[in-house]
Amino acid sequence: GTRRWYGNNSNVVFWKNNGEAIHRCEGSVFRNSDFYFKSGITWSGISNSGSTFRMCPDGYLFDSNKGPMIFESSTDLNYLIALLNSKISAFYISMLNPTLSLQLGNVVSIPVVGEMNAKHDCVLELARNNISLCQRDWDSFETSWDFTTHPLVKLKMASANPWGNNNESAIRLST
């Protein structure tokens, strides 16, 4: 599915001994390994529902099917993901590449206004909030590696005790 800001982390790579088993596979190619396991911004390589950009934290790999990644300092990543998920970037992308396959070259062609922007700090805060909200949403599904409890179970547990207290008070008042 299409997710914006965070998520779609679904595959596990057996990386024991620096990927030794994968290195032994005929035809395996390792490119840009200096960037492996570093945080960045990624997107689906092919999409028919528009481009959506997601934060990919430390500890992940990237490939051409999931989409390339952009690596910057963490502040720049938050600013960039806000820009990339904006309507203006969607417009630029539709002009630069009106196909289903979004390439890194198209993404880096989007003009970026840095800290000269008066709203820079506000944009950073909104981006961090969006990433946090989307991470909580992603982690509320069993497909997330960080899933613990479904949110409805938490809601039921939180609401069960006040309901019991209210009923107990009502019963005392009626007797």
Language model regions located:
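Generic surface-pattern signal
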Residues: 17-20, 85, 89, 128, ...
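Segments forming glycine/polar-rich beta-alpha architectures that bind adenosine-containing cofactors
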Residues: 1-62
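Non-catalytic DNA-recognition/assembly elements of restriction-modification systems
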Residues: 109-175
